[in-house]
Amino acid sequence: AELKAEWAKEDATLASFKDTKHSQYGGDLSRKGKATGYFHVEKKKGKWWFVAPDGYLFLSISANGISPGGGGSIRNPLKGLYTDKAPEGFVAPQLPVMNRPQTAPQGAPQGMMRPQQPDKYIYLTAWNNFRRFGTENVQAKANQLVVDRMNYWGMNTIGNWSSRDVIALGKKPFMVSLSGLGINNGILGMPDVYEEGFAASVDEGIRRSVEPYIGNKMLIGYFVGNEPTWSNIELRLCELIMEADDARPLKKALVSYLQKNGDTDQARIAFVYETYEKFLSAVSTSLKKYDPNHLNLGIRYGSGVPSQEVLALSKKYFDVYSFNNYGLQPNLANMDIIYKATGMPMIIGEYHFGTTDRGLGESLVRVTSQKDRGVAYRNYTEKAFSHPALIGTSWFTWYDQPLFGRGDGENYNIGLLDATDRPYEWMVKAIQAVSENCYDVHSGKKAPFDQIPERAGGTFPDFWE
């Protein structure tokens, strides 16, 4: 009864909210750029901006994994520990799988859909949709709740790995990943561009990826990949290529290159960049062919600064430079280095803060309370938007991870919502404050929020790196 009362209170709050400050695409009605009919980027008075299709300036405030029901967890990790049953009529959600070369099945396309596995996964958050809405039109009601929450919170963009049903409502701008690019079949995330038919395969993958979105004015753009492992360890990549099967085209190409240019560290690194450019060129050519109206949001690099050669290639082929940056603060010094080399607008694709006070893991960046999660979010996000190139941030992730862990066991307190489908109050307040202030912060009219969380524990090692 207490939980249903809280849900009802939230429903009433959401129903009474009206947004009068933003256009239908989420742009700031007080700031104008050029209307082109699609999202694009513009530099005005030394600051980069997204510009919405109707011409209003737009800063993207987003979260990854936005969905009406989370991702599920492994059933009964300890035999007999969990015996609850799914509500009658429940259908397991199909959610995009994060593309990590270390875990994706061999040959799996980037952004593939996880199959329904009701016998393996416990979908606690999705079950709550049935408890909240009953069985009539439950999915439609749950999808609309996502949009209503985004409106009230001030979150204007559906981030990566999110529900296609929510995207299909056509009520919020969104970003998606391209599929079928050969990344998962590569080595350390470097595709084998020398494989017979590689360009044709990429072309077909992109054609299929963009087909549902051509002409969709809510789409901001496409990501090409996520955290390429080989970046800044190019020599290690070459070692692994040389250890591969002799029949592998990528190895044959490296051996041939070194025979012609000498087997030196410089030659090996040069081969990596030449290979990477072949990949980026193939992707760029096909993307422009099939969908020239939407942005190439690039590969979300890791937290460090890639080499100058990689930065130059990013400038050549991407419209926006994207990177993930876990830390108590955005790394403005690194952003300055990247901006000096590329002059490009930027997106932070992942960051988060967590704590242990809900019985979950602390996350990659630890603070000591739910209040401090909100403080950390506002501090980080407004400081990020104070950079002249930063035009978007995407929190990771929408829901807390399950207590028993997602597929790889990760169980962090990193959600905007908990397992009982209740928003974290301090996070909501922080997002609302960022939404209210970010345009003035970015334009230089207002200083970013400078309070920092008390006794924050710093950064936990990221074992994905």
Task: Annotate each PLM feature.
Residues E2-L169, I187-M218, G262, Q266-E274, ...:
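Active-site-adjacent substrate/metal-binding segments within catalytic domains
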Residues G55, M150, I158, Y222, ...:
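Conserved, mostly hydrophobic/aromatic
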Residues I66-L81, L169-N184, K217, V224-K260, ...:
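Aromatic- and acidic-residue-enriched segments that line the glycan-binding/catalytic groove
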Residues Y121-N129, N185-D192, D265-A267, G302-S303, ...:
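Active-site clefts of carbohydrate-active enzymes
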Residues W161-V166, G180, F223-T229, R300-G304, ...:
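Short, solvent-exposed turn/loop segments enriched in Gly/Ser/Thr/Pro and often Arg
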Residues N216-G221, G225-N226, Y351, V365-D418, ...:
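Substrate-binding cleft of secreted/luminal carbohydrate-active enzymes
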Residues C238-K252, F396-E465:
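Aromatic-rich peripheral "rim/lid" segments of glycoside hydrolase catalytic domains that contact
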Residues A270, E274-T285, K289-S363, E382:
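Glycoside hydrolase catalytic-domain groove-lining segments
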